[in-house]
Amino acid sequence: MPDNITYSISGDLKHIAKFDKLVDFLNQYNSSKKIICNYINFAIPASVCKNIFLYKIHIHFPIDIKQLIITTQSLKDQNNLFELIFDIASLDDYLKAWEIIEEYQIDKYQFNPIYTGYNIDFFKENVFLKKSDILSTSMSIKDFFIKQMINNNDFGKINIMPNGDVHSNINYPALVNICTHSIFELIQKEIEEGKSWLRVRNQEPCNACIYQWLCPSPSDYEIMIGQTNLCHVNIHNPNCENL
């Protein structure tokens, strides 16, 4: 396997079949390795996991502070690298997360906005882009043209489920099953029929906007919300914004 591949294991570690063998396999490579799990489902890593993975720990609200302390302390005790990811669905969640970060002096953290189907106003206020956001983002000529061809968020990523089904994006149907198809067949099908790797801003209303290729590649939020333009730009008058 190429060393520039990133391996990510997601889910409840206790339910991953033959986990020790999987770790032994991954340990043969110098590639980046991540474990992505919930702080509630977190299992104290076995000795084979020590210092091999970067742990990305998702935290949802309401937070069980006692369990969070147990999880973070177990990682610290084994000198594992970890980052806390707060799943934020409201301004109240954000403020509570900051209280925890400051009280427990958390150094490595991220805020991950979560769309619930009922918090579109929160997204419009805090996630949707303004014209100033778009224009203040630095970009090379190379990146400008890359965005016209591929999706920077999804390109090259595959998700292998426990039953062998392979998704280029878990929001779309499986492309193939790894037990019956080769990696070559998977890549060929995604390039020819898939919706993820080549998903760019060529749909309405983005295809009529002067900022079309300055914006980030479409993300999972566009799929979940069912809207292609998560911004406040008025395409008919780019100097005005839809607030």
Regions found by a protein language model. Give the residues of each.
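A C-terminal junction/extension of Radical SAM enzymes
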Residues: 100-172, 214
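Structural motif
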Residues: 8-17, 35-43, 56-66, 84-92, ...
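Non-catalytic interaction/Regulatory regions outside core domains
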Residues: 67, 74-83, 88-122, 227-243
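A short acidic (Asp/Glu
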Residues: 46, 70, 95-97, 169-171, ...
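Long, charge-rich, low-complexity alpha-helical segments
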Residues: 1-12, 16-29, 33, 208
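Acidic (Asp/Glu)-rich catalytic clusters
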Residues: 25-29, 44-54, 68-79, 101-104
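A broad structural signal for short, well-ordered beta-strand segments within beta-sheet-rich domains
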Residues: 2-6, 31-32, 54, 79-83, ...
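Flexible mid-to-C-terminal extensions adjoining Fe-S/redox cofactors in radical SAM and related proteins
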Residues: 175-243
